Amino acid sequence: MKTLTNATDKEEILRRLQAIEPGTQRRWGKMSAHQMICHLADGYKMYMGAKKVKPAPGIVPPAVLRWIAIWSPMPWPRGFPTVPELDQQVDGTPPAQFEADRRELYGLLERLTRRPRDFEWQPHPHFGQMSEESWMRLSYLHANHHLRQFGV
């Protein structure tokens, strides 16, 4: 299973992020390529506690949803609603300058995977408290999902 704990998997994500350009067209969804870069950065900020996000209401218990999203072999569905704080068209960080925003994302990815950690994992709005293993798997899956959205 791919995870950002694995250096090869992390390099794969970094290489694919480098292939994204401001004009890269989405295959589904509403985000632009630049908004996706900011969305991933906001996610990493949330994971590390630098961006506060309210818990999302749901009818499926967080532990069940967490297992389905992180450990089941099913691909993530398209169009799953994001929380407002991570939605660039609502309360997410607005895109500013593409290369600067991408550099920030790279820096956040490095900080996320650095050992020892200089932060504590924050609860996920849909999945609640998670282990480092789950966070690193989710981090890979989230980036992979959006990179597939843009065909890279």
Language-model features, listed with the residues they occupy:
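N-terminus-centered regions that define maturation/targeting leaders and the start
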Residues: 17, 33, 40, 105-108
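Globin-like tetrapyrrole-binding proteins
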Residues: 4-7, 17-18, 84-96, 105, ...
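An N-terminal domain-cap segment
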Residues: 1-30
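Conserved, structured core segments of small domains
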Residues: 25, 76, 80, 101, ...
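Short, contiguous alpha-helical
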Residues: 24-71, 118-152
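Short, helix-capping/interhelical loops that line the mouth of catalytic, cofactor-
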Residues: 49-100, 104
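A short secondary-structure junction motif
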Residues: 20, 47, 112-116
